[in-house]
Amino acid sequence: ELARQQVDAGLMVWDFASDEYPDLVMAACGDYPTKETMAAIDIVKTHCPNAKIRCVNVSSLTTVGFGTLRRVADQKFFDKVFTDDKPVIFNFHGYPQTVKSILFNYAVDSTRFDIRGYKEIGSTTTPFDMHVRNETSRYDLAIAAFRQLGRNGVVPFEEAEHLASIYQGKIDENTAYIKANGVDLPEIDAWVWPAARGLDEAKEEAWHGQTN
């Protein structure tokens, strides 16, 4: 039912990954940007559990607005999804200018939107490193989120900067690992949403039970 609602609307707040009355909205459009955004939310909530984040997924957009051609999001629905005043970090699978141009259809302060997307930066490299080069990786998004929460006073500024430096270090660590091994760190591909971790563990235990 929820999947059908998203197909009809073209965008949806993912309640299972969201808090009420958010301090920050993290949005994504596209499979890989969505995975990186979800991983970034996991990172931020791990370190800043009191920070309230809304997760928005966009599955369809048009030149005249977010949503589908049959059901373009009007201003009221746009504000309901993205709020009318909170900062938004938007991870996109295409050029950032595409999303920026769509925002012109709405009465919105575009400066509160931090839009990430393809910059034509990178060549033959690993999938995650391509995200890093385009600043669309989970670590880049988490850094942006920490700093935004620090600017807004949700997290102490010094703490936000410290957390940002930790994840810049994670980026550097993975870059060094790629140079030595030609692949990303195993933890990158191994990530799953927290609610799924117990399911994975249960499946593994069941498998071992059958083979022992």
Walk through the language-model features, giving the residues of each.
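Thiamine diphosphate
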Residues: 1-211
